[in-house]
Structures are given as C-alpha cells and as structure tokens.
Amino acid sequence: MFNKLLAKNTQHLIGLDIGTRYVKAILLEQNKQHITLLAIACESINGNAFAEREIKDFEALSQALKKIKLSLKGKAKQVAIAVSGQAVINKLAYMDDDLTDIELESQIELEADSLIPYPLEEIYLDFERLGPSASYPSKVEVLLSAVHKDMIDSRLTLLNEVGFETKIADVEVYALANALIHFAAASESTNDNSAVLADKIVQCCINIGASQLQFCAVYDGQVLYTKEHNFGLDVLTQDSC
C-alpha cells in the first residue's frame, strides 16, 4: 500500500491525522525500496471544532493545519487522510467469485440499497475483494466501505484552501491495519529471525484518541479483526480521577 502511495511521481507524502483535539502529521519520502520519516508535527485545535467527527469550527481547524504546514518546512503538498465515526460504514458482502472487478462494481451498485442504509447519491462507496469465502462456496468476500459525502467534501475543501492536495482518503481503522501489515513485512525483509517469527503471530494495535479508541488485529498479512469505540482519553481520564 505505502509503495503504491509513494510512486515515482509522488516522492513525498504527508500523512495527516485530524483528531478532535489535535492535528498530527508525518512527512514520508520514498528512496528506492525504503520509506524514510523526514518530519513530524503536532498542533492543537482551539476550542471544540468537532461535533461527532463533523467539522463545526472551520477556522480553528484551518489555523491548526496552517501551523502543521509551516512546521513540516517542506514543499510537499500531497496528503493522505482517514475518517472514522458513525458516518463511516464497513460491511462484509458475498458476491459471485467469477465476476471481474468492473462487474463486481456494477453488482455492488445494483445491490447498494440492501447493503448500505443510505442513498447512493449521498455517499462515497469503495470496495476491496478479500478472497474466497469459507462459508459460502463459489462466493468471494468483499469489504464495502461507505462514508457520507459531507464528511469527505468538507475536509477536502478545507485542505485545498490551506494548500494541500488530498491524494488518499481512507478509513482510519483500516489505515491502521495496513500500516501494521506493511511494517511487519518490512521487518521480515531484514532477515531478522525474531521479525520473521513475529509476522507469524497475531499482531495488534490500539489507537487511543481524545474521543475514540480503535483496535485492529492482523495475522500473516491479513486483517483478522477491527473495532471502533466512541470513547477515548477524555472518558478514561475522567474515570481515573
């Protein structure tokens, strides 16, 4: 995934994590087969700029993004973002295994009303073919991801105004899992025996934000389980007081 993002025409890429309290960023560079972390930045967002992951105070978020841009001190403009929350829907569907990707896309659009509880014109819909189904012969498992257009469009507009160009919009929990898979594979390529063994066990990652907690588990390059909870450090610190 990361190698595809950092193709020859995209030597630098900024990963943006837009939270409810902070904006975090990393600047990545691809050099041959290696990905290098060039810079990191973190800026607070004044006030309560979000309500249930929807942007309410565009000016506060814009100021934080401008500070991020200055902190990275580079000319890179292309960014990767991810979204989460109740406006994001992930669902597993089962489709005929003899369909091409184009046929699969057409079939998903035809069945969208029964698969996604929102009108097709109100969402962005994407899918990924996971592989043969163990439960249903001659079927393939397909992961569907849908998000309200407003959630994506508001972020794209704001990022564009600040001077960023959005290259990738992903789902947070799957971006987390893909990063875990990628770096596990990168560790294995070093020929470290411990890294090879680590790739053959279940690996987990927890991302704890101010208002959300995300968990993912991967094994041998595959996502086993993901879960998102609508509580984070705000609730945890209150409970500990």
What residue spans do the PLM features occupy?
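A structural microfeature
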Residues: 39-41, 168, 225-227
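Solvent-exposed alpha-helices and their adjacent loops that cap or buttress functional pockets
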Residues: 6-8, 135-138, 189-190, 194-199, ...
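Active-site neighborhood for divalent-cation/phosphate handling
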Residues: 78, 82-188
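Envelope-exposed proteins and targeting segments
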Residues: 12, 39, 140, 211-213
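A short acidic Gly-Thr/Ser loop motif
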Residues: 16-23, 84-86, 197-200, 205-213, ...
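Non-catalytic, solvent-exposed interaction/assembly segments
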Residues: 1-111, 153, 165
